[in-house]
Amino acid sequence: MERFKALEQLLTELDDFLRILDQENLSSTAVVKKSGLAELLRLYTKSSSSDEEYIYMNKVTVHKQQNAESQDKAPEQQNPLTNGEPPQPSSAPQKSLPDLPPPKMIPERKQLSVPKIESPEGYYEEAEPYDTSLNEDGEAVSSSYESYDEEESSKGKSAPHQWPSPEASIELMRDARICAFLWRKKWLGQWAKQLCVIKDTRLLCYKSSKDHSPQLDVSLLGSSVVHKEKQVRKKEHKLKITPLNADVIVLGLQSRDQAEQWLRVIQEVSGLPSEGACEGSQFTPDAQRLSCPKPDITEKYLSASECGSPIDGHPEVPETKDVKKKCSAGLKLSNLMNLGRKKSTSLEPPDRSLETSSYLNVLVNSQWKSRWCSVRDSHLYFYQDRNRSKAAQQPLSLLGCEVVPDPSPDHLYSFRILHNGEELAKLEAKSSEEMGHWLGLLLSESGSKTDPEEFTYDYVDADRVSCIVSAAKTSLLLMQRKFSEPNTYIDGLPSQDRQELLYDDVEVSELTTAGEAPEEATPATDAPGEPDPDRVYLDLTPIKSFLHGDSGARAPSPTPPHQDPPAETLPLPEDSDPAPDEPLIKSPENPELQMQQESQEPEEPSLGGTEVKLQAGQQKTSPSPSCPDTVAVTPAGSSPPVKDRLKAASPEIKLGKNRTEAEVKRYTEEKERLEKKKEEIRGHLAQLRREKRELKETLLKCTDKGAAASLEQKLREVDEECRVEERRRVDLELSIVEVKDSLRKAEAGPVTLGTTVDTTHLESVSPRPKAATPTPAPDCTPVNSATALKNRPLSVMVTGKGTVLQKAKEWEKKGAS
């Protein structure tokens, strides 16, 4: 009897002790031992109960039948209220058998599954479906070990849980630092409850305790973790884990104690110091924002009203899928709405193509803090978050500063900002690409001439160095283009006192090179009644005559021979008197042609003041100030000075033909130079590739470790040089394409300005001289100017309303788009 009493007391004390352990934070080994002990206690009490029941039933006598029937009815009446649990005994047992444990432990601790008093009617089979050990796989660890909220007043409200089987649970928890069922944030803001286990230095997430392969396996070495606490309907606790080479992980916990416990374990595993209990400014790298949405103030944690189950409670595993189905649509819709709000509330200008702001880790008082850093106006600004509502520290002036990469094993992508050797700030990026991007930004804003390739990068991985250098060059180039890219329509606008067109300068420069003195030309040009200084444009109707030959002679002038009139286009005077002493052959049709041109002068107002500009053509004309309409042909033996003057006075020279030819020549030479440079780069690339191939073959055959290390270093250098040359080749190809396009436009001539030739006007003036002019001698044939202009390849540009400049700009915009 004493042994049974001692056993009864042992069971009671052991059950109380296990209940106390449920309230404590245990190590993984203690948790495993406690679970095994609880399982053994359950099996023992169940097996001993059945033996006692068997003995008890066999000892019933006829005289005690009434008592036995009353005892059989008692559990039958109380069974619906206790879900098959043992009721309180109404009377002492008939035999001196071990009593059941006190009834106070039965409703509160169902994990032990205290044996039930069964009856012959088969209540054992009916009570079996009510056992929670069959259906509560997914909630055991979370509720039994860590799920104790500050606001949880009654534990009887939450459903009891336990591990489904020792082979499923203990195997996952073996050698674990900590484990629990936690909410994990998934794609598009959905939450899923998973078994989270930290073993060694890795975080493992299982869909249920029966799974043997984790859905998520991430190394926590070097990762940062932040605890965020919100007061929405109930306190929400989230841990945001940022691994080095993986997506951000957000875990939802049910109490502050549980969150602090997990935070402490993760910090011990990662080896990073704490960033504060409720630091809320941790960030997500750009490459990870696509797969994991950033936590925002507008995002709501999965609460009881949204999912139909309390946060501090734990739904049954069969209901988990239904919960997800109920909540997934609402989460997706609310998340999409939140994404729209994020875009609308962003303070960044929408037209900015170069990103000059992002989150960086900043070393503050020997601790790394996440700050929103922004570069503008040669200053680096630090903010608490991306809303820029609160400045974290004073802005840093970047003028005259140096940027130096300073990687370390714990902070691979850190760099320093120095001024005269003194460290002003130490920053850390999240990836090699982001580090290169910021190096380029800071180099551009500081005015440093240092090339990103000149930095010393203490990395073994050549790809990482190449990524940093490439990103730095890209951001540096974009910053330079942002402030120095020319704009055709706003840069270099002509001033009021400046001449309007470039063709004026062409005329003056050509005359100066021809050796003509402007002082002597002034009396001839300033004729009475000709106050207009702009003589670049020609009126279409009183047009100059063009000759078939390559050289032409000017009509004689009453001025002395030593005075050379300037090569300007003058308005046509009404009469002209050729000098009789000039040995020129006059055409007999000159008076008729003169009358024809004089008769056309009244038609000039009908053209609306239209002026044309001669752009191209091989014919040359030389109008005289006194006799511009006299057409003559010079014999083949003309003197060289006359030819020089004719060349200088050519309208093509005055009106831009040589300018077009000069552009064609310049673009042609530029294209040839770039082609030659491209061939040199190709040859160098081929040589580098041969050298790389030979190094690889030598490295495969090499057995000496020292020589192999030097060969590997040389191979990395050659590989990096190949990448640099390949980028140069690509840039050169793009430059060649641009030069070819410019050359094609230059060869097309001024027609690309979008103007057209008014052929109807040319045809209206051409029939009259044809009818009135007989066939002259071959050596003195006058040329009808309108016919010559019509036959020339679009050399005269006629516009109806004087909108040449407007059409030119429209055409340039069309070509640019």
Swiss-Prot record:
The keyword Cytoplasm applies. Residues 63-164, 512-657, 754-786 are annotated as: Disordered. GO terms for cellular component: cytosol. GO terms for molecular function: protein tyrosine kinase activator activity. Residues 123-139 have a biased composition (Acidic residues). It is found in: Cytoplasm. PROSITE patterns: PH_DOMAIN (PS50003). Keywords: Coiled coil, Cytoplasm, Phosphoprotein, Repeat. Residues 175-271, 353-447 form the PH domain. Residues 512-528, 767-782 have a biased composition (Low complexity). The keyword Endoplasmic reticulum does not apply. CDD domains: PH1_AFAP, PH2_AFAP. The modification Phosphotyrosine is found at residues 56, 413. Its main location: cytoplasm. It comes from the Eukaryota. Residues 754-763 have a biased composition (Polar residues). May play a role in a signaling cascade by enhancing the kinase activity of SRC. Contributes to SRC-regulated transcription activation. Interacts with SRC. Interacts with LCK when tyrosine phosphorylated. This is Actin filament-associated protein 1-like 2.
